[in-house]
C-alpha cells in the first residue's frame, strides 16, 4: 500500500467531522449516520474531556463508529491514540504537537493517513518532512469545544501558511460554522473540520449538507 496521493487527501478533507460521545446531546451513532448521509468526507474519533469513555467502553464505542464509517466508505481517523488506531486498524491517526512525535507515528502506522496539528511554519515544515499527509491549522476562530487551544490564528494566519509555500492539504479547525466556512476555504484550506457545528446541530444532516455546499462553492 502506498501513501495517499495529495489530490485524494485534499478531497477527503472537504467536510471533516470530529466527534466523541460527550460532544452530542443525543445518540452519537444517530448523529454520525445523519452526518454521513449529509456528506461527511472523513471522520475523526476524539474521545476526550469531561464525561468521556475509557477502557473497554471507549474501544467498543470506537468500533461502532468505525463500522458505520466503513458502510459509507468514509475514512475513520483516531485522534492522538496511535495504539488504538493500530488495534482498530483505523485508516489513520491525527496527532497534535504535544502527542507522540510524527517520526515514530509514521514508523508505527506505515502508509496510513497521518494528520498533524500545526500552529507555526516551523511545525508545519517539520511535520511534512517527516511524513504528514495533511495539516490541521487553527484555531481559525474562537472555540469552546477545546479548552487548551492555542492563540486564534484567523484566516490571515491560514493564508500565511500558503504564502510561505506550504502546499500539502490543509484543513482549517476551530470555531468553524456554516457562515464562516467560505472565508476558511478562500484563505487556502482544502476543507473544514468541525465538532459542534454538526454534533450539536438541530439536524446533523442539514448542517453537514450546508457545510459541504459552502466548501464546494468556495473551492
Swiss-Prot record:
Q: Tell me yes or no: is Disulfide bond among this UniProt entry's keywords.
A: no
Q: What is its EC number?
A: 2.5.1.3
Q: Which residues bind 4-amino-2-methyl-5-(diphosphooxymethyl)pyrimidine?
A: 44-48, 79, 117, 146
Q: Which reaction does it catalyse?
A: 2-[(2R,5Z)-2-carboxy-4-methylthiazol-5(2H)-ylidene]ethyl phosphate + 4-amino-2-methyl-5-(diphosphooxymethyl)pyrimidine + 2 H(+) = thiamine phosphate + CO2 + diphosphate; 2-(2-carboxy-4-methylthiazol-5-yl)ethyl phosphate + 4-amino-2-methyl-5-(diphosphooxymethyl)pyrimidine + 2 H(+) = thiamine phosphate + CO2 + diphosphate; 4-methyl-5-(2-phosphooxyethyl)-thiazole + 4-amino-2-methyl-5-(diphosphooxymethyl)pyrimidine + H(+) = thiamine phosphate + diphosphate
- List UniProt keywords, sorted A-Z: Magnesium, Metal-binding, Thiamine biosynthesis, Transferase
Q: Does the keyword Magnesium apply?
A: yes
> What pathway is this protein said to act in by its record?
Cofactor biosynthesis; thiamine diphosphate biosynthesis; thiamine phosphate from 4-amino-2-methyl-5-diphosphomethylpyrimidine and 4-methyl-5-(2-phosphoethyl)-thiazole: step 1/1
Q: Which SUPFAM superfamilies match?
A: Thiamin phosphate synthase (SSF51391)
**The protein's enzyme class:** transferase
Q: Matching CDD domains, A to Z?
A: TMP_TenI
Q: How is the cofactor bound?
A: Binds 1 Mg(2+) ion per subunit.
Q: What biological processes does GO assign it?
A: thiamine biosynthetic process; thiamine diphosphate biosynthetic process
GO CC term, one of those recorded: cytoplasm
- Where Mg(2+) is bound, by residue? 80, 99
Q: Which residues bind 2-[(2R,5Z)-2-carboxy-4-methylthiazol-5(2H)-ylidene]ethyl phosphate?
A: 143-145, 175, 195-196
Cofactor(s) listed = Mg(2+)
What Gene Ontology molecular-function terms does this entry list? magnesium ion binding; thiamine-phosphate diphosphorylase activity
PANTHER family recorded:
THIAMINE-PHOSPHATE PYROPHOSPHORYLASE, THIAMINE-PHOSPHATE SYNTHASE
Q: Which family does it belong to?
A: Belongs to the thiamine-phosphate synthase family.
Protein name per its UniProtKB record: Thiamine-phosphate synthase
Amino acid at each position: 500500500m502506498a501513501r495517499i496521493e495529495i489530490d485524494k487527501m485534499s478531497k477527503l478533507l472537504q467536510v471533516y467531522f470530529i466527534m466523541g460521545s460527550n460532544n452530542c446531546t443525543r445518540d452519537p451513532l444517530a448523529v454520525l449516520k445523519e452526518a454521513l448521509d449529509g456528506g461527511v468526507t472523513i471522520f475523526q474519533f476524539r474521545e476526550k474531556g469531561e464525561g468521556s469513555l475509557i477502557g473497554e467502553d471507549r474501544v467498543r464505542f470506537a468500533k461502532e463508529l468505525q463500522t458505520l464509517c466503513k458502510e459509507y466508505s468514509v475514512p475513520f481517523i483516531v485522534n492522538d491514540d496511535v495504539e488504538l488506531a493500530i488495534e482498530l486498524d483505523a485508516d489513520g491517526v491525527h496527532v497534535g504537537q504535544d502527542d507522540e512525535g510524527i517520526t515514530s507515528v509514521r514508523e508505527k502506522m506505515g502508509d496510513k493517513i497521518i494528520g498533524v496539528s500545526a500552529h507555526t511554519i516551523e511545525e508545519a515544515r517539520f511535520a511534512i518532512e517527516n511524513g504528514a499527509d495533511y495539516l490541521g491549522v487553527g484555531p481559525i476562530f474562537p472555540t469552546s469545544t477545546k479548552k487548551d487551544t492555542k492563540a486564534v490564528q484567523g484566516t490571515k494566519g491560514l493564508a500565511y501558511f500558503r504564502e510561505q509555500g506550504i502546499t500539502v492539504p490543509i484543513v482549517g479547525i476551530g470555531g468553524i460554522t456554516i457562515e464562516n466556512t467560505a472565508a476558511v476555504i478562500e484563505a487556502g484550506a482544502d476543507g473544514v473540520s468541525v465538532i459542534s457545528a454538526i454534533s450539536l446541530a438541530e439536524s446533523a444532516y442539514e448542517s453537514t449538507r450546508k457545510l459541504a455546499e459552502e466548501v464546494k462553492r468556495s473551492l
